[in-house]
């Protein structure tokens, strides 16, 4: 087997192959033949799935500098080394079905990376530097142990497909609603109890799957007329069992994001002072300066400055930004034309988040 492997690599070196297939070779170590002398300078695609590799060499980028695709699916790799960041031409990296516990921050240096697959590992967090991957189109981090997603993920402006199924997420950063190219978002089998108010506001986002998040009872009304999966959501549970802000209408109850400070009703006549001030600041700086960076960080607490950059949400009726208070209105999915598509497998409601009593009274999901 060793001689056959050496022969395969030698032929690839002599004939300057661009593709090399080393799948199913029972390899426990990265082949030294690949790293000899100058390495394989012409190699662009390396396939090494279903081996028993536990690590990657530190000089990988030096010996294989022109790698465009690296497939290491189904090995036993525990750590993505710092050296991976030197593969500056890499566009596809597949480390699915390994034993990954750590992804090094240097992965953010892979500025050409378009597809990153890290499914079926043991990751508890992703480094913030993932947000530096401006060309990233596909990110699959399903079946890990993630509790949160890095907020800088919203800086991946080319991201189209994000899959985070079967993790331990209990919330989704509202900043992800700013992803301009996101077309499909799958978060099935997590611990979500609420979704960002603006999820679905982007016209690019067409597919959202949140199946089997049993505490999830409300979907932002922006998701109406999108392709959604929500089977197994909205299981009966006592509100007191979940320490989250909730809103009830009739026999329906939904949980709201922790950033919501107050829930308005149709009987309110005046907005809270902080909400009025934030809306005024927002419109002033957007209309006069066109750039919130002109606002000195010293003038406002960091939390409020962040809200100005990324509001809690936008009114589902008039698109007015909201910062502290929302006026919710429920539309049970079973009472909409979409009921037949879900075959009664869910008890969730669409939630319209409005900015005022006027918008609350005039909003109609079905009109």
Swiss-Prot record:
Keyword list, A-Z: Leucine-rich repeat, Repeat
InterPro entries, per database record: Leu-rich_rpt, Leu-rich_rpt_typical-subtyp, LRR_dom_sf, LRR_domain-containing, LRR_R13L4/SHOC2-like
Pfam families: LRR_14, LRR_8
Stretches forming LRR repeats: 16-36, 42-63, 66-87, 89-110, 112-133, 135-156, 158-180, 181-202, 204-226
Gene Ontology terms: biological process: intracellular signal transduction
Origin: domain of life: Eukaryota
PANTHER family in the cross-refs: LEUCINE-RICH REPEAT-CONTAINING PROTEIN 28, PTHR48051
Protein name, UniProt field: Leucine-rich repeat-containing protein 28
Organism field: Homo sapiens
Phylogenetic placement of the source organism: Eukaryota, Metazoa, Chordata, Craniata, Vertebrata
